[in-house]
Structures are given as structure tokens and as C-alpha cells.
Amino acid sequence: MKNVVGIGGDMTLSDQNLKENITIIPNALDKVKSLTGNTFKWKDGYPANATNAGSNDTGIIAQEVEALGLAGITSTRDGYKTVSYKRLIPVMIEAIKELSAKVDALS
């Protein structure tokens, strides 16, 4: 791809003209229900060079996301999994829409 412009901050290139094979995420609610929100304490020294190393935090488990086949999981050189939380937002949007349809059906 040529002439790609990097965008700083939380902006993500998302132009429809750059995409193909666009489909709605199926069974998003089931996928979200399979994930668990957790509280945890980082092990000493992790994440490396982070101000929250050894402190309490909240998050999800990368291996759970990966097992669902969702995008946004990568591995560090050390083999640790990372999660791109912003890649989960489209799944959550579709899950909310599925849940909303269920609520509407009750009316």
C-alpha cells in the first residue's frame, strides 16, 4: 500500500474505500459473554518499565480473546500475549445491538 499516512493518538484509519469483504460480526453477544472482566495484581516486574508494575489493575485475559478468534491479539518477543482493547469495540457494538433487539422483542 502506498501513501499511507500515520495518525497519532487514538485515531485509527477506517475508511470504507480501503476495505473489502466487509461483513457484520456474527454472534457478537455470545463472544462478549464468553469474556471475563477481571481484577488482578501484576506480578513483580510486569509490565516491564510500567508505573503500575506490582499494582492492582483490571482487564481481560488475552488467551480468552484469542480462543474466540477475535482480532487484536499479538505476542511480544518474549511470547507474552497483548490485547488491543480498541479492536474489541466493534464486537461490543454488535453485541449491544443484538441485546437491544432481544429487549425490543420483549416489548
PLM feature segments, named:
Residues 1-85, 102-106:
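C-terminal intramolecular chaperone/autoprocessing and neck/assembly modules of extracellular spikes
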Residues 89, 93-107:
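Long amphipathic alpha-helical coiled-coil
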